């Protein structure tokens, strides 16, 4: 390895470590991902990333290599293929996010995928990470939809070849090309990634894109998606279409196949280490998720689950009088019994008395899911939080107003009348503590 390569790696590690989290957090995830029984990660790299953000991609992958982790890379090359086809004046079109592939398009696709694959492999090896390109010998396919032309429907995945590359201490770099007998076939890269993950069953499945996540109609990043609660709602949105809609459909199909605890992340290359090695992550985290139930008059069992979640989350004791008037409370709780919200209705405006997620579930998106369901029911709500509460950044990002006091920060949504806001602030300041 050259001196310049060593310096590159040193600078890369320093830059990435400083950008993510604590050493304790990083070591926790490295230990988790280093299990010999399970592959570390399948990372799908969008073609636009290779074209426009190769340096950050290679930096992040070299970092993983340096800490002893070998991801399996599957890349696309959509923008480069479209450009090559336009240069050759070859017509092409899409059906539901998939490229219609004539014989001419297929042949150009093969050349573009080979070039893109080689570009990634050479960039990795230049910086000291061994890599091997796998262009058309991983996916055995059939043609299921004649309207799409030479597009493969994956029937099986050559896991043995992938494992051989990993065991030779190299990073597999896979192109989305398949074969039927001796016939090469084009494959949508997102679909190929889903089938690869099903076959490999890694700890993590990550999609790297230039945008770094899924954004809503106002251009805001969606940090968490709970498919159980939000999938149908999202699929009905006009702003979700074409490639991103297909991607979400494929991710749902993947998570339906995997254990309920599995997740898929969409992020950008520079934030890949943060997504892997911190609880907060970066980009959009998609999980199968859990349903959320309302308990308008919480029974004894619900009260016990609520007490356990809150006391674990707040590291204190719920006051004995909390459920003295259970009819004034509306308890939201996830079906996994790891996140809860209590809304008190004993004031003129609904008051969020408690919002808790157990520490072990931090970073799983449970809080976002239960918050989403609570807001469907309560367009008006206010609450308070200690000034040092780490969730205050989230509260600040979603509230419509905030009053900061020495002991409490008071937040509200959906309240515009000044007198009502003033009354809510007074109520929140003077309300006795419910966890001691």
Positions of PLM-derived features:
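Conserved active-site tyrosine of GNAT-family acetyltransferases
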Residues: 395
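Conserved acetyl-CoA-binding loop of GNAT-fold acetyltransferases
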Residues: 398-405
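C-terminal catalytic "cap/lid" subdomain
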Residues: 2-381, 389-390, 400, 410-436
């Amino acid at each position: 390895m050259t001196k310049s390569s060593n310096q590159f790696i040193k600078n890369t590690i320093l830059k990435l470590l400083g950008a993510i989290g604590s050493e304790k957090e990083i070591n926790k995830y490295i230990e988790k991902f280093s299990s010999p029984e399970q592959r570390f990660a399948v990372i799908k790299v969008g073609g636009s990333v290779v074209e426009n953000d190769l340096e950050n991609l290679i930096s992040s992958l070299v970092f993983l290599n340096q800490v002893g982790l070998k991801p399996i890379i599957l890349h696309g090359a959509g923008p480069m293929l479209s450009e090559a086809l336009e240069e050759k004046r070859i017509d092409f079109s899409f059906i539901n996010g998939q490229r219609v592939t004539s014989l001419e398009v297929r042949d150009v696709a093969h050349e573009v995928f080979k070039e893109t694959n080689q570009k990634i492999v050479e960039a990795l090896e230049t910086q000291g990470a061994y890599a091997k390109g796998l262009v058309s010998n991983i996916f055995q396919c059939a043609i299921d939809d004649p309207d799409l032309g030479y597009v493969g429907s994956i029937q099986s995945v050559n896991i043995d070849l992938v494992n051989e590359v990993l065991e030779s201490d190299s990073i597999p770099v896979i192109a989305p090309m398949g074969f039927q007998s001796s016939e090469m076939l084009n494959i949508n890269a997102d679909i190929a990634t889903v089938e690869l993950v099903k076959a490999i069953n890694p700890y993590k499945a990550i999609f790297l894109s230039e945008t770094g996540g899924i954004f809503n109609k106002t251009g805001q990043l969606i940090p968490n998606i709970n498919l159980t609660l939000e999938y149908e709602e999202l699929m009905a949105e006009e702003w979700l279409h074409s490639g991103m809609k297909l991607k979400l459909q494929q991710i749902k199909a993947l998570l339906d196949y995997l254990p309920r605890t599995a997740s898929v992340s969409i992020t950008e290359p520079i934030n890949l280490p943060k997504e892997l090695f911190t609880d907060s992550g970066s980009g959009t985290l998609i999980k199968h998720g859990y349903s959320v139930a309302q308990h308008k008059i919480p029974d004894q069992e619900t009260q016990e689950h609520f007490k356990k979640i809150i006391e674990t989350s707040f590291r204190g004791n719920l006051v004995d009088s909390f459920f003295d008037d259970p009819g004034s409370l509306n308890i939201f709780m996830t079906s996994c019994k790891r996140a809860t919200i209590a809304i008190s209705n004993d004031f003129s405006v609904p008051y969020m008395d408690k919002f808790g997620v157990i520490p072990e579930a931090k970073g799983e998106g449970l809080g976002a899911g239960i918050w989403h369901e609570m807001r469907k029911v309560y367009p008006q709500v206010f609450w308070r939080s200690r000034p040092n509460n780490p969730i205050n950044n989230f509260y600040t990002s979603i509230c419509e107003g905030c009053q900061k006091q020495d002991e409490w920060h008071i937040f509200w949504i959906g309240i515009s009348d000044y007198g009502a806001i003033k009354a809510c602030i007074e109520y929140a300041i003077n309300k006795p503590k419910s966890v001691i």
